Structures are given as structure tokens and as C-alpha cells.
From Swiss-Prot:
Specifically inhibited by XAV939, a small molecule, leading to inhibit the Wnt signaling pathway by stabilizing AXIN1 and AXIN2. Inhibited by talazoparib. Not inhibited by olaparib, niraparib and veliparib. Residues 25-36 have a biased composition (Pro residues). This is Poly [ADP-ribose] polymerase tankyrase-1. The lineage of its organism: Eukaryota, Metazoa, Chordata, Craniata, Vertebrata. Pfam families: Ank, Ank_2, PARP, SAM_2. It catalyses: NAD(+) + (ADP-D-ribosyl)n-acceptor = nicotinamide + (ADP-D-ribosyl)n+1-acceptor + H(+); L-aspartyl-[protein] + NAD(+) = 4-O-(ADP-D-ribosyl)-L-aspartyl-[protein] + nicotinamide; L-glutamyl-[protein] + NAD(+) = 5-O-(ADP-D-ribosyl)-L-glutamyl-[protein] + nicotinamide. It comes from Homo sapiens (Human). Residues 1112-1317 form the PARP catalytic domain. CDD domains: SAM_tankyrase1_2, tankyrase_like.
Length: 1327
């Protein structure tokens, strides 16, 4: 569903306009003739402006020619010479018939009316550019523009209103009538692609009408030339002639090819257009496409049988005239590497887009010089191999080492590919340069099944390679060596039997191979001998039978040698088979006897012989036919004469006892001879038919155990299973199926047992049959499937018969009851094979059916199943904005960063479709906003809404953001901050009344106390007075740290830089003006803005940026924050699943966050809360973990990042325990873990957490889940208190971002817990 927009990323159609200049692909023109073509002797060619006509016409007039001005010279003239009067005649432009919009009066006009002389050639066209008409006057837009319109009237174009239309018309004064108004309107509609007008105007009478005033083009010429696919389709439906020719001999296909309309070309070819049609100058459509460089069209033409060797009247082939861009297609080199890669990787779509007869056997330019077939065969791409073979791939092609594709397939054991290649004539004993055969390859790699296949096609295991080794020698196991020898002997015997070569049979015959079966067909030597056309087949048959051949052995179709002999009327060997005990009534897979086969073939004498041997003519096949019914009139006559006409008394009593369920009588009467007797006076039913139809379970069981035939058919072709199913006898049906009854057998009306059960509403029977492979798509003689026969309202059976489709439909429609009834462990992940290959969960997720999705997930649905586009259910939910579904899928551990075939993640989907809440949910659970799709786009690149863009920018790490979005934070080392140097932006500190212990002693505004390591007041020599920073930090603050090496090499400090100008900076190698300007202005602002002792900090505070003050580890403030963090580690109920397993942090860095704007916003909100809460703002220092930390320190807390699915709704969550916040660092529940290792318990990667000032104000105490978007009325926050079945530790939730200030940014690692022994040792050492 969500993938329907993919095509826009992969297909971009570019329409190339015709150029007025002569094309480079035109053949060199011959010397100009004495007269300009198309002008009367003694006539001076008129200039384009003289007649008001453009020098060439545009493609919109329905005709495309590869060269000349759009017309063809008479056959006896050179083609398209330059005009003798020097006017610019374009040798490669095309003339298209022009249709004037105004009515044309069919009157005779003098030649002076348009300034054009009559055409003496009589071809209806002129070669002079001055004779080409244009849709507009010479001052209008270029005729090559496809969008330009027709002239409003002939006079507007400088042509007399009485002149005929178009350049293809005879000159004025010739008396040719003008085109009728209705036809003109039709041609104009075809040209413009107005399909509704075309449908209104076209009919059988005018669909092939010619533009008699122009080039005699048909409407199809116009529509094809302009690429109007819809119009072309309609015209073809109306009977348009794809072979219609205009004056120049062009068919519509020429036009479509000339202008590169590949879809129209395909359409015309599919409708029978001749790809090798020649115009009057023997130009084919391929000439046209090649000259114009229409690569796609060239490929389509070649794929449809275009002959690249056809030459025009000048003796030029398409390759000779091809534009350079198209030459590669005609040499087979076009995108050869891509074609080979498509064959290797199995990319059918790509392969078929490039494959032509010219490149189907191309060889790679490097490596092994493989062909596409070599690669497809070696990589087991069965479908690709099929396609290549269908399109003429050479099975004998050799690579650099002399290997044929069969070598590759056999070497890697690809059975199906090997079979395909052999079927298409691959040489089974082909040798490479080292004389290795495919059998050598297969045997040496122990490809047992492939070896058998090769041997069955004549592979010789005795052939030796260049090392003198045979395939048998190279077999790695004794078992394979023995098998190769055995099968080779067996196949040799089969071949000798086929040839009825008595001497060879005697030579190869051995006891162990007498009943050897061909692995694929299961034929024995006896089958081969009786089928042989050679005269000694009888002697060979006798020899084989004497030596122990099984006379009743069956091949894969269950045919005995007697079946084979009878079918071929080999009566001589039938006699031998009968003498050696052949079963006369053995059945093949179709339930046919040898008599059926002989009757079907019309062998009268064979039928007589079989009847004399005891064949039963009353046996009914699985299709419901007796032998007589399958034979001709003569066969029917002799068979009907021998058919018994009444049932014996014993048989009659047995049939009645079976019907009545009289088991004792059945036991007395039943024998192996009459267990399958027939009710000859009735329906020819057997005892089993009666017992099954009357639900006599015990009788059915007894008959089955004593040889009753479950496949026996009555007169109507019904088997016992039909009877049981029709009457709903479940136990009997189950018995019959268990004893091998065919669930898909059909009667004479092609009703299967499933038809019977469905029509009678037998739900359980239908279920049983389907479970055992019944085909619900089979149709009866009336074309009805079992589903069509279900009674209206019987929805349970309807759903059952629809099978997977019903479950998919129920999931799509959100019908939980149907889903519960239909869902089984076998079909819970079934696929919509007619659509996107979606699972029920895909559909439930895409259609927002929460209850269905939950049921499917609870019962084992695959949460990460991919459809044919690679989308998982979360893609669907994200694409359509179904937040609850997405949350449910995440709960069941779906992959939030799963990618489809185009590398789109669910976050890409949500961002592109403007799903804000979905983006927040995905990001909160670890979605990676930096992942790129195949086109290199991140979700941010696809975001359509401003709030989503802001959300994604906040979630992305700074290094992944585009430069324009990167927040600039200044990091200042602790050593640069003196006690008195606190910037003004830190002075607005709030109280920390609620803090106790070491944290309560922290000075809010300062970074350290007076005794904690400051830089001192003394300055080093050479520093600018009052500056507490070095040149490296200054460059970093400007984003110019890459210039540091230059400054260090030249020993330039800040005081030296302060005296430098543009010229001096340029001399030391800083050539970019922008860099020099930034340096000079930066120093000026730095010096001009000094306040206190640290003007650098003041400067940045003025600019409202964020400053990160590095605290020194020995600083009391650092130590207090670390102690608070370490001391609040707790053990959580999830056992470390979310935040990792640890008992201590390794604190790497603690930075104080300074941002004047955020501080002021926090203080303002704190004041509001205090006023609303009796002057108590209730501030706490709390921890916060989030994937948005980088955004928070720059922009503050943003409630848009919140997810409504949290325990207390869409709030911002804080904790007094650092280990609780650690669980959210990579997202809710730990997200997907660290970005590098995808590990929630990673001990390597650095993490970041915030220690924040939070104004709680009046808090609402809550013990259970409550979804809120805002704080409860009269309250400013929610405190989730611990309870028995609720929270283990308290959570603090605010719903306005300005109620918290990120005071400290802590960078840390979790530490792996020490082993107990190590802990004990450490404790002892400490003691």
C-alpha cells in the first residue's frame, strides 16, 4: 500500500523536443541536383517568409521522418539534398502534416496564392523547405515545440484560405479537395490527445480515413506521432489499420519510433505492426529510432523482432545511420554490465528492460568473459535462465576457460537449471579447456542428483580430463562412484533396449540392472523395448523377461509395458507380455487400462487382442469413460459386443447388503473377485459406492481393507467420495481420503467432491477436503467453482472456500469474529498473492484494525513479515498515521528501522505523509533519523510539515544535520573560567530549596568556587588583555578549526591576529575572502564586547546561543552531580532489558548548560507557577533521558516530542533515579540500543543524560495509567507514585517544556558488573 509511490523515484520520462538544426546522424548528402526537389522546372524556390511558412514542421502534425524536411524524394532522386538556392533546408528534420483549424473552401487556387508552385513529382510532397507548411506564422513559436497550437486560420499562416492543408498536399491550383471539417476535427483531436473528442468523432467509416490534403496520414499516424497512447488504444479498438501507409510509405509505427514514444511503439507492435516495415526509401522503424537516438524504442523494436541488418535505398543499415547515443544498443554493448548484473542477481524486470537479440549472448568485458546465461546458470536464477533461453541465449557459448553454462549449473548443483539447459540442447559432454565435462564438475562437488540427471541425458562418466581423470575417479565418496557406475550401465541398457539391439542388450545386461529405472520417467528396459520401432523388439522383450524383468513395472505415469505396447499397437510384444503374466486391467494415473489406450488410438486389432486376453471393457477411467466411449465407431462396436449385460446373483446380494449396512452378509459374500462388482442394471455402482452413500461406516471400513477400489467410477463418473460428501457423511469421507481417494476427482459434469459438499452446505466436509488438498478453484462443466454453488447466506462455507483470501479480507475489514474463526497457525501469515503479497497483519495495520492486529499478534503473526515491496506492517501503520497500531507493533518487537526494497524506513513513510504523532512515537522508540533511502534521502529530506521537520532536526545528531540546521554550541574548558568570570546570562538563577546534601551547596551561577582551579588573573605574554581563550578555541567558535595548522605554523596568537588585515591573512595562505572576513570581524566583536573578565562568554550570551561549560573532575560541583547520579542507581523489574545490566557509571564528562533565552523562559514560567501556587514553585533537580538531548540543550524541552501512549499521556518525563532515565536514553524501553552496536547494554558507546531543574508547582498524585495531553485542571504536573502493580519508582511529568531547564549534560558509559570474586577482592583491598 505505502509503496505505490515508488514508481516516481524510478521512472522519469523526458520528452526530447525536435531540433531545427540538421541532425548529426544524417548521411552525407549527395551533390545537389540541378533542380530543388518538388519545384516545377524553371520555378524559383520560394523563401519561407515569402509564403509565410516555417522551414520545417513540428511533430504534433502526426508524422515523423528521420531525415529531410519531412517528405521523401521520388525513388529515382537522391534523398534530401540541400536546396540549390541556399535556403536552410534541414536534412534531419521531419515534416508533419498540418491541419488548419479554420474551414477550408474546396476551391481551386492559383499558385501565386501561397507562393508555392505545384509539385511536378506527383508524390504529394515537396522537398524544399519553403514548401513545408507550419501551424503558425513565421513570427510564432518554434515549430519544434510540442505545445504550440495550430494557426487560427490559413490566412494567419500566410496561406490562402482556398489552399489545401499541409505540406503533403499538391500545390494550389491542382484541384485536390480539402479535408472535410469532421475529419479535420478528428485529426486535430488525435494530434492533441483529446480522447473524449476522438471517441465522439471516430467511427468505423472514418477510423482509417486519410488526410487527402496532406501526406495522406491516418488518425493513427497522428496519434502515434504525438505519443497519444490513450487515443491510439481507442483507435485500435475501433479497427484502425496498423499497416496503413502515408504518401512516403510510412506506417504509424515509423512515426511513434521517430519521436521516441516507447509505450505507443509497444502497443502498436502488440497489435501486429510490422517492426520491419519499409517506407518508400526502405527506412524501417529501427532506422527512424536509431537516427533520432531513441534508445528505449530501439530496444523495444529489437525485442519484437526488428532486423538491424536491413539497409535503406542508400545501402545504410540502422547502425550506419544511428545517433552516437544509440549505437551501443545496435552493437549489443548498451548497459552490458547492468544486463550481466541483472542476470547474476535475478533482477527479471531489469533484464527484460535491456535484453535484445543483439546482447543476449554478450560476454563480460573482464573476469571470466561470461555471458548472461553463464551467470544466471551459476547463480541458480531459474526464471532468468528460462527467459534467456526463450530469447535465444546460446547454450553452447563458452567463457574464457571454455566452460559452457551447463558447467556452471552442474558445478553448483542447480538441478532445475541443468534440466532446462539440457532440454534446450546443451551438450551433455561439452569440455572446457582442461577437458572437464559437466559431469566432472558435478561429480567432484558431490552433486548426486545432478549427476543422475546428466547420466540420464547421455553423460559419459568414462571420459577423462587433461589429468587423465574420469568423473568416477573424481567422485569424493565410494557411494557416488558406485552410483555413477550403476546408473551408467543402466542407461546403457535402456539405450540398447530402445534400439532393440540384441547384441548390445546381451553385452550390457546384468542381474543388478535388469529392472533399472530411468530417474525421471521411471522407464525400465522393458518399457523401452516394447516401445521400440526396431524389428528385433520381440526378441529383446523375450530376453529381458527371461532374465527377470518385471512385466508389470510401472513408469511415472503408472503405465505398464502393456499400456505402452497397446498404445503403439505393438501386438507382437503384447503376446509376449501376456504369456509372461501381464495384468490386463492394470490402471495408470488416469484410471485407464491398456484397452482404454488402444481404443483412444483407434487400434481395432489391438482391442480385439486385449479382449481375447481378458481385458474388462466396462472399467471406467477417472474421467468417467469406458474404453468404448473413448474409441471410434468401429472400436465401440466390438467393445459393446463383449460387455456383460446383467449382474450375477451373488454380486447383486453383495450390493444390496452394502447398501443396507449388513456387515455379516458382506463378509460372507465378499471376495477379491467381486469386491468391485457393478450394479450393471443401475448406475454401475460398486459396493463401496452404496456403503459410502448410505453412511455404512463399518461396511466401508471392511470393503477398504479387502481391496475395494476408492477410484472406481459409476456411470456418471462419480467415485464413492462424491457420494459421501454429497450427503455429509464425515466419517466415511475421512476413511476414503485416508485410503487414498482423490479429493480433486471429477465426474462427467466435472463436479468434484468439494462441489458436492459446498452445494449441500456441508461445512465440516469442505474443511476436511480442503485440508487434504482439494482445489477450490476447479470449475465444473458450467464454469462454476465450489464457491459459486454455495447457497446465499452460507458465509462460513464461503469464507472457508475463499481460504487465505477470506482471512485477508476479514483482516482488511476489521471483522474480528471472522478472523478468529478462519485463523490457524498454518494461515496466520498467509499472503495476498494477487496483490502486494501482504499478510493479514499488513492489512490490519494499514486499515487501522487494532483488535484484529492484536489478535493476530497474540496468535503468532510475524510482526516483521515483508510484502513484495519489502514493507513490514509498521511501514503501513506509519504511512497511514495509525499511532495505536504502530505502538502495538512496537510492543511486539517490530523492527522500527526496517527498510523496504527502496530503503524506506517507517520513519521515512511517516515523515513523507506528515504523520507527526507517528514520527514522535518512532523516534521515541529508537527510530534512526539519519538512515537514507536508495536515493540518499533522510526522513528530513522527505518531510512535508514544519512540525515534523522540527521534530526530525531535534532528533538528529549534529554531525548528520545539513549545515543550515546545525545548532552551534560553544564548549568552554573549566580551566578558562575564573570565580569572578560568571557571565551575565547565568545570574538569573532560581533557588534550589528542595535540594539537600552536596547539591544544595552548589552555587547556581558560578562554575566553581574560589578555591577550585581557575586560570588566575595573570596573563601570558602575548595575549590580548582580558581574554581567557586561545587561538584554537577562537577558530572553533567561528567554525574555522581547519585553519588551525596555518596559525600554529605561523605562530599567530589572538593579539597578532588583532593587528592583521586582509592582505596579511592572504599572505599566510588564507585565500577565501569569506574566511578572512569572518576572522577580522570575529576579533573586532570579541574585543569590542568585553565585559568582566571573560568577554568571550558575554559575546555568545548576547547571541542567545548555548554554551557548555566543562566542569573539572576536581570541582565540587562536578563531584556533587556525579555522586547524585551514582547514588540513584536502582535495580529495575525488567532485569536490565531497557537500560542495560550495570551497577555503576563511568562518568566521562559533566557540562553545565548555559543558554540565556532558555533560562529566561524557564524563570518566566517558574514565576507564573509560583503565582498560581501560593508563591511556591516546587523546584526539583531530576534526571531526564531522551533521544532528543542535543535538541533540548539548544532549544529547551518540547512537548511535541511527547508520545500520548506514555503512562501519563503526552508529557515530558523525569526521574529522581538516574537508572530510570538511563532506560530512555535510546528511546522508550531502550529503543533499539546504541546506534553502532544496536545493543541496549552496550558498555562501549558513550551515552548522554540531563540533570535538570524542574518546576513542578502543584502536583497531581496518580497511581495508575491515565492518558493526558495536559496537566489536570489546577495542577502543573503529575507525580506517578509507586504501587504494587504499578510503578516501581516515582516519575515526574510536566506538560509544558518551559517548566524544565537542562542544567547539566552528563556524558557517561554504563559499566559491566564485576564478578562476585572480583568484588570481594576489591572490598578486601579497600578494607
Amino acid at each position: 500500500m505505502a509503496a505505490s509511490r515508488r514508481s516516481q523515484h524510478h521512472h522519469h520520462h523526458h520528452q526530447q523536443q525536435l531540433q531545427p538544426a540538421p541532425g548529426a546522424s544524417a548521411p552525407p548528402p549527395p551533390p545537389p541536383p540541378p533542380l530543388s526537389p518538388g519545384l516545377a522546372p524553371g520555378t524559383t524556390p520560394a523563401s519561407p517568409t515569402a509564403s509565410g511558412l516555417a522551414p520545417f514542421a513540428s511533430p504534433r502534425h502526426g508524422l515523423a521522418l528521420p531525415e529531410g524536411d519531412g517528405s521523401r524524394d521520388p525513388p529515382d532522386r537522391p534523398r534530401s539534398p540541400d536546396p540549390v538556392d541556399g535556403t536552410s533546408c534541414c536534412s534531419t528534420t521531419s515534416t508533419i502534416c498540418t491541419v488548419a483549424a479554420a474551414p477550408v473552401v474546396p476551391a481551386v487556387s492559383t499558385s501565386s496564392a501561397a507562393g508555392v508552385a505545384p509539385n511536378p513529382a506527383g508524390s504529394g510532397s515537396n522537398n524544399s523547405p519553403s514548401s513545408s507548411s507550419s501551424p503558425t506564422s513565421s513570427s510564432s513559436s518554434s515549430p519544434s515545440s510540442p505545445g504550440s497550437s495550430l494557426a487560427e486560420s490559413p490566412e494567419a499562416a500566410g496561406v490562402s484560405s482556398t489552399a489545401p492543408l499541409g505540406p503533403g498536399a499538391a500545390g494550389p491550383g491542382t484541384g485536390v479537395p480539402a479535408v472535410s471539417g469532421a475529419l479535420r476535427e478528428l485529426l486535430e483531436a488525435c494530434r492533441n490527445g483529446d480522447v473524449s473528442r476522438v471517441k465522439r468523432l471516430v467511427d468505423a467509416a472514418n477510423v482509417n480515413a486519410k488526410d487527402m490534403a496532406g501526406r495522406k496520414s491516418s488518425p493513427l499516424h497522428f496519434a502515434a506521432g504525438f505519443g497519444r497512447k490513450d487515443v491510439v488504444e481507442h483507435l485500435l479498438q475501433m479497427g484502425a489499420n496498423v499497416h496503413a501507409r502515408d504518401d512516403g510509405g510510412l506506417i504509424p509505427l515509423h512515426n511513434a519510433c521517430s519521436f521516441g514514444h516507447a509505450e505507443v511503439v509497444s502497443l502498436l507492435l502488440c497489435q501486429g505492426a510490422d517492426p520491419n516495415a519499409r517506407d518508400n526509401w526502405n527506412y524501417t522503424p529501427l532506422h527512424e529510432a536509431a537516427i533520432k537516438g531513441k534508445i528505449d524504442v530501439c530496444i523495444v523494436l529489437l525485442q519484437h523482432g526488428a532486423d538491424p541488418n536491413i539497409r535503406n535505398t542508400d545501402g545504410k543499415s540502422a547502425l550506419d545511420l544511428a545517433d552516437p547515443s544509440a549505437k551501443a544498443v545496435l552493437t549489443g554493448e548498451y548497459k552490458k554490465d547492468e544486463l550481466l548484473e541483472a542476470a547474476r542477481s535475478g533482477n527479471e524486470e531489469k533484464l527484460m528492460a535491456l535484453l535484445t537479440p543483439l546482447n543476449v549472448n554478450c560476454h563480460a568485458s573482464d573476469g571470466r568473459k561470461s555471458t548472461p546465461l553463464h551467470l544466471a546458470a551459476g547463480y541458480n536464477r531459474v526464471r532468468i535462465v528460462q527467459l534467456l533461453l526463450q530469447h535465444g541465449a546460446d547454450v553452447h557459448a563458452k567463457d574464457k576457460g571454455g566452460l559452457v553454462p551447463l558447467h556452471n549449473a552442474c558445478s553448483y548443483g542447480h538441478y532445475e537449471v541443468t534440466e532446462l539447459l539440457l532440454k534446450h540442447g546443451a551438450c551433455v559432454n561439452a569440455m572446457d579447456l582442461w577437458q572437464f565435462t559437466p559431469l566432472h564438475e558435478a561429480a567432484s562437488k558431490n552433486r548426486v542428483e545432478v549427476c543422475s540427471l546428466l547420466l540420464s541425458h547421455g553423460a559419459d562418466p568414462t571420459l577423462v580430463n587433461c589429468h587423465g581423470k574420469s568423473a568416477v575417479d573424481m567422485a569424493p565418496t565410494p557411494e557416488l562412484r558406485e552410483r555413477l557406475t550403476y546408473e551408467f550401465k543402466g542407461h546403457s541398457l535402456l539405450q540398447a533396449a530402445r534400439e532393440a539391439d540384441l547384441a548390445k542388450v546381451k553385452k550390457t545386461l546384468a542381474l543388478e540392472i535388469i529392472n533399472f529405472k530411468q530417474p525421471q520417467s521411471h522407464e525400465t528396459a522393458l518399457h523401452c523395448a516394447v516401445a521400440s520401432l526396431h524389428p528385433k523388439r520381440k526378441q529383446v522383450t523375450e530376453l529381458l523377461l527371461r532374465k527377470g524383468a518385471n512385466v508389470n513395472e510401472k513408469n511415472k505415469d503408472f503405465m505398464t509395458p502393456l499400456h505402452v505396447a497397446a498404445e503403439r499397437a505393438h501386438n507382437d510384444v503384447m503376446e509376449v507380455l501376456h504369456k509372461h503374466g501381464a495384468k490386463m486391467n492394470a490402471l495408470d494415473t488416469l484410471g485407464q487400462t491398456a484397452l482404454h489406450r488402444a481404443a483412444l488410438a483407434g487400434h481395432l486389432q489391438t482391442c480385439r487382442l486385449l479382449l481375447s486376453y481378458g481385458s474388462d471393457p466396462s472399467i471406467i477411467s477417472l474421467q468417467g469413460f469406458t474404453a468404448a466411449q473413448m474409441g471410434n465407431e468401429a472400436v465401440q462396436q466390438i467393445l459393446s459386443e463383449s460387455t456383460p449385460i446383467r449382474t450375477s446373483d451373488v454380486d447383486y446380494r453383495l450390493l444390496e447388503a452394502s447398501k443396507a449396512g449388513d456387515l455379516e452378509t458382506v463378509k460372507q459374500l465378499c471376495s477379491s473377485q467381486n469386491v468391485n462388482c457393478r450394479d450393471l442394471e443401475g448406475r454401475h455402482s460398486t459396493p463401496l459406492h452404496f456403503a459410502a452413500g448410505y453412511n455404512r461406516v463399518s461396511v466401508v471400513e471392511y470393503l477398504l481393507h479387502h481391496g475395494a477400489d476408492v477410484h472406481a467410477k459409476d456411470k456418471g463418473g462419480l467415485v464413492p467420495l462424491h457420494n459421501a460428501c454429497s450427503y455429509g457423511h464425515y466419517e466415511v469421507a475421512e476413511l476414503l481420503v485416508r485410503h487414498g481417494a482423490s479429493v480433486n476427482v471429477a465426474d462427467l459434469w466435472k463436479f468434484t467432491p468439494l462441489h458436492e459438499a459446498a452445494a449441500k452446505g456441508k461445512y465440516e466436509i469442505c474443511k476436511l477436503l480442503l485440508k487434504h488438498g482439494a482445489d477450490p478453484t476447479k470449475k465444473n462443466r458450467d464454469g462454476n467453482t465450489p464457491l459459486d454453488l454455495v447457497k446465499e447466506g452460507d458465509t462460513d462455507i464461503q469464507d472457508l472456500l475463499r481460504g487465505d483470501a477470506a482471512l485477508l479480507d476479514a483482516a482488511k475489514k476489521g471483522c474480528l469474529a471472522r478472523v478468529q474463526k478462519l485463523c490457524t497457525p498454518e494461515n496466520i501469515n498467509c499472503r495476498d498473492t494477487q496483490g502486494r503479497n501482504s499478510t493479514p497483519l499488513h492489512l490490519a495495520a494499514g486499515y487501522n484494525n487494532l483488535e484484529v492486529a492484536e489478535y493476530l499478534l497474540e496468535h503468532g503473526a510475524d510482526v516483521n513479515a515483508q510484502d513484495k515491496g519489502g514493507l513490514i506492517p509498521l511501514h503501513n501503520a506509519a504511512s497511514y498515521g495509525h499511532v495505536d497500531i504502530a505502538a502495538l507493533l512496537i510492543k511486539y518487537n517490530t523492527c522500527v528501522n526496517a527498510t523496504d526494497k527502496w530503503a524506506f524506513t517507517p520513519l521515512h513513510e511517516a515523515a513523507q505523509k506528515g504523520r507527526t504523532q507517528l514520527c514522535a512515537l518512532l523516534l521515541a522508540h529508537g527510530a534512526d533519523p539519519t538512515m537514507k533511502n536508495q536515493e540518499g534521502q533522510t526522513p528530513l529530506d522527505l518531510a512535508t510539515a514544519d512540525d515534523i521537520r522540527a521534530l526530525l532536526i531535534d532528533a538528529m545528531p549534529p554531525e548528520a544535520l545539513p549545515t543550515c540546521f546545525k545548532p552551534q554550541a560553544t564548549v568552554v574548558s573549566a580551566s578558562l573560567i575564573s570565580p569572578a568570570s560568571t557571565p551575565s546570562c547565568l545570574s538569573a538563577a532560581s533557588s534550589i530549596d528542595n535540594l539537600t546534601g552536596p547539591l544544595a551547596e552548589l552555587a547556581v551561577g558560578g562554575a566553581s568556587n574560589a578555591g577550585d582551579g581557575a586560570a588566575g588573573t595573570e596573563r601570558k605574554e602575548g595575549e590580548v588583555a582580558g581574554l581567557d581563550m586561545n587561538i584554537s578555541q577562537f577558530l572553533k567558535s567561528l567554525g574555522l578549526e581547519h585553519l588551525r595548522d596555518i596559525f600554529e605554523t605561523e605562530q599567530i596568537t589572538l593579539d597578532v591576529l588583532a593587528d592583521m588585515g586582509h592582505e596579511e591573512l592572504k599572505e599566510i595562505g588564507i585565500n577565501a575572502y569569506g574566511h578572512r572576513h569572518k576572522l577580522i570581524k570575529g576579533v573586532e566583536r570579541l574585543l569590542g564586547g568585553q565585559q568582566g573578565t571573560n568577554p568571550y562568554l558575554t559575546f555568545h550570551c548576547v547571541n542567545q546561543g548555548t554554551i557548555l561549560l566543562d566542569l573539572a573532575p576536581e570541582d565540587k560541583e562536578y563531584q556533587s552531580v556525579e555522586e547524585e547520579m551514582q547514588s540513584t542507581i536502582r535495580e529495575h523489574r525488567d532485569g536490565g532489558n531497557a537500560g542495560g545490566i550495570f551497577n555503576r557509571y563511568n562518568v566521562i564528562r559533566i557540562q553545565k548548560v548555559v543558554n540565556k533565552k532558555l533560562r529566561e523562559r524557564f524563570c518566566h514560567r517558574q514565576k507564573e507557577v509560583s503565582e498560581e501556587n501560593h508563591n511556591h514553585h516546587n523546584e526539583r533537580m531530576l534526571f531526564h533521558g531522551s533521544p532528543f538531548i542535543n535538541a533540548i540543550i539548544h532549544k529547551g524541552f518540547d512537548e511535541r516530542h511527547a508520545y500520548i501512549g506514555g503512562m501519563f499521556g503526552a508529557g515530558i518525563y523525569f526521574a529522581e533515579n538516574s537508572s530510570k532515565s538511563n532506560q530512555y536514553v535510546y528511546g522508550i524501553g531502550g529503543g533499539t540500543g546504541c546506534p553502532t552496536h544496536k545493543d541496549r547494554s552496550c558498555y562501549i558507546c558513550h551515552r548522554q543524560m540531563l540533570f535538570c531543574r524542574v518546576t513542578l508547582g502543584k502536583s497531581f498524585l496518580q497511581f495508575s495509567t491515565m492518558k493526558m495531553a495536559h496537566a489536570p485542571p489546577g495542577h502543573h504536573s503529575v507525580i506517578g507514585r509507586p504501587s504494587v502493580n504499578g510503578l516501581a519508582y516515582a516519575e515526574y511529568v510536566i506538560y509544558r517544556g518551559e517548566q524544565a531547564y537542562p542544567e547539566y549534560l552528563i556524558t557517561y558509559q554504563i559499566m559491566k558488573p564485576e564478578a562476585p570474586s572480583q568484588t570481594a577482592t576489591a572490598a578486601e583491598q579497600k578494607t
